[in-house]
């Protein structure tokens, strides 16, 4: 690496540290639009009602995702229920067939990320969010029915799971679209983290709730229960939410003014899909800082979420019943830290104690560093108490990153936040290969967990350094420019110009130069004709 590049990287890190510990009072551009809102209980504010209801929506979605993972234990194995009755396996699926049915969900989930971001930027994001959970809820009920369609059960279930993945894949980009209209700049962290912590609550409650329903009733009960709950939630969401404060039914005038004036025009103008700054987005180092951190976060999250029970069983020799209860604590700790960090970040920014960039980099560095340190310890620890403590600290500390890179989309490009979220989540879904890597390295080899944790630690460290160097906290220049609305006639005109240009080049090669003169006199230059038309009129007015 050239000396200049090394010097620039060192300066970027030094500037971040200097901003973090400086006593300077930072004046945020958002504070220039000072509006006094009447103090009232936060649940009476519509934006907080939306945040809390979105929290439950994410919880339902992650509960739905846990249903099949729990139900399969009774479907493909001999099972003793809560009443002591033994049930024989109902389905003779192989491990490969079950794996194909489960993985089909993630294929649909990854495929819908980027299209969901574009749709959330173009249409009402609150309706897209609702449709995602509504479709997934219907698919959940259909899943319970589809398991009985022999002999094509596996194919039918794969299709249903893929559609369910497509539906739930729109949630994160759509929610970023919702906050684009509803979250004032200095409340983004706490509103967004309140909504997104629903995913941890869904994991924390979905697994034991599904296990209870499977054990006390049947394997199909969780599918029906979570499906019905999701449908009921969709009806409530449609009443509470709306596209923007201007279209809401019962929002107070005070809150409407508070939200719309603080957000300003940067987030309320429509955009043309043909004129989105795709090149600027994909060549922006700040955007790639978010994408890289999304990948790193997904790698660690999938590792700790999907494999911690297996790790406890194979390495720590903890019984599955006990490990299932223990797994609640990491998710609970993550929720607490995520909510607390969101409040802290907005306080530091609104009080002027730290700049937006310093806040994002600080909490991001803290979360990834704590997780990396604990994963490094897990590579060498074999004592169950110490190992479980490291797991809890790793998950708990990592909760702060949701107030770092995960809301940085709003800081650098608020109008394109749902699109950036879709791009980051879509590319970050590549981290799903981590499950395959983990299974390959640890198959009949408990010592392989050492290398799994060391690899995850290295990925976290890379994410910390990349974000420290390249992340930004202000709106980027290409995100400030108003979008050009291209009508159908303008599109046809642009295409006709290109066609005539190609035709002109062809004629020039053949020696026909009269076409250039003909094009100059054509209607392709309307501005000059208007000027010529105005000239006689101006002369006549001056003479009169």
Curated annotation (Swiss-Prot):
The keyword Nucleus does not apply. Residues 508-544 have a biased composition (Basic and acidic residues). Residues 501-544 are annotated as: Disordered. One of its GO terms (biological process) is sodium ion transport. Residues 71-104, 149-154, 215-219, 307-323, 382-384, 438-450 are extracellular. Keywords: Glycoprotein, Ion transport, Membrane, Sodium, Sodium transport, Symport, Transmembrane, Transmembrane helix, Transport. Belongs to the major facilitator superfamily. Sodium/anion cotransporter family. VGLUT subfamily. The keyword Ubl conjugation does not apply. It is a multi-pass membrane protein. Gene3D superfamilies: MFS general substrate transporter like domains (1.20.1250.20). The chain crosses the membrane at residues 50-70, 105-125, 128-148, 155-175, 194-214, 220-240, 286-306, 324-344, 361-381, 385-405, 417-437, 451-471. It is found in: Membrane. It comes from Caenorhabditis elegans. Residues 1-49, 126-127, 176-193, 241-285, 345-360, 406-416, 472-544 are cytoplasmic. Its main location: membrane. GO terms for molecular function: L-glutamate transmembrane transporter activity; neurotransmitter transmembrane transporter activity; symporter activity. Glycans are attached at residue 78. One of its GO terms (cellular component) is synaptic vesicle membrane. The gene is vglu-3. This is Potential vesicular glutamate transporter vglu-3. InterPro entries: MFS, MFS_dom, MFS_Na/Anion_cotransporter, MFS_trans_sf.
């Amino acid at each position: 690496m050239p000396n200049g590049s090394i010097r620039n990287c060192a300066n970027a890190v030094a500037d971040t540290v200097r901003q973090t510990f400086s006593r300077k009072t930072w004046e945020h551009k958002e504070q220039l639009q000072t509006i006094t809102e009447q103090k009232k209980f936060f649940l009476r504010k519509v934006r907080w009602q939306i945040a809390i209801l979105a929290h439950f929506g994410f919880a339902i979605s992650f509960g739905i995702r846990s249903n099949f993972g729990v139900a399969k234990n009774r479907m493909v194995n001999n099972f003793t229920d809560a009443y002591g009755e033994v049930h024989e396996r109902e389905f003779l699926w192989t491990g490969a067939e079950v794996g194909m049915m489960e993985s089909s969900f993630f294929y649909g989930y990854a495929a819908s990320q980027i299209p969901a971001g574009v749709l959330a930027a173009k249409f009402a994001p609150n309706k897209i969010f609702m449709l995602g959970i509504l479709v997934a809820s219907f698919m959940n009920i259909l899943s319970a029915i589809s398991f009985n369609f022999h002999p094509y059960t596996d194919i039918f279930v794969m299709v249903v799971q893929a559609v369910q993945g497509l539906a739930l894949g729109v949630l994160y980009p759509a929610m970023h679209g919702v906050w684009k209209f509803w979250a004032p700049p200095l409340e983004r962290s706490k509103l967004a983290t309140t909504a997104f912590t629903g995913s941890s609550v869904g994991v924390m409650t979905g697994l034991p709730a599904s296990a209870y329903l499977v054990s006390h009733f049947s394997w199909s009960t969780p599918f029906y229960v979570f499906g019905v709950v999701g449908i009921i939630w969709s009806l409530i969401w449609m009443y509470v939410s709306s596209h923007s404060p201007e279209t809401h039914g019962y929002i107070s005038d005070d809150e409407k003014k508070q939200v719309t004036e603080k957000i300003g025009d940067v987030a309320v103008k429509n955009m043309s899909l043909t004129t989105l700054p795709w090149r600027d987005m994909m060549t922006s180092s700040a955007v790639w800082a978010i994408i890289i951190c999304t990948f790193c976060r997904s790698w660690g999250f999938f590792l700790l979420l999907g494999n911690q029970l297996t790790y406890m069983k194979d390495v720590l020799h903890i019984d599955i019943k006990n490990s299932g209860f223990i797994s609640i604590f990491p998710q609970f700790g993550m929720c607490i830290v995520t909510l607390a960090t969101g409040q802290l970040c907005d306080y530091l920014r609104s009080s002027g104690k730290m700049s937006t960039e310093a806040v994002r980099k600080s909490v991001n560095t803290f979360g990834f560093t704590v997780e990396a340190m604990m994963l490094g310890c897990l590579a060498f620890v074999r004592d169950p108490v110490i190992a479980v403590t490291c797991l809890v600290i790793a998950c708990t500390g990592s909760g702060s990153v949701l107030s770092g890179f995960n809301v940085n989309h709003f800081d650098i490009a608020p109008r394109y936040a749902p699109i950036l979220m879709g791009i980051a989540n879509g590319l970050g879904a590549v981290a799903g290969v981590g499950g395959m890597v983990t299974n390959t390295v640890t198959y009949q080899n408990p010592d392989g967990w050492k290398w799994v944790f060391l690899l995850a630690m290295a990925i976290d460290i890379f994410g910390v350094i990349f974000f420290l160097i390249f992340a930004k906290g202000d709106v980027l220049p290409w995100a400030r420019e108003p979008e050009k609305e291209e009508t159908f006639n303008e599109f046809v005109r642009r295409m006709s110009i290109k066609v005539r240009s190609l035709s002109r080049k062809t004629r020039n090669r053949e020696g026909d130069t009269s076409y250039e003169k003909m094009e100059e006199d054509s209607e392709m230059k309307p501005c000059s004709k208007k000027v010529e038309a105005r000239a006689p009129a101006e002369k006549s007015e001056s003479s009169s």
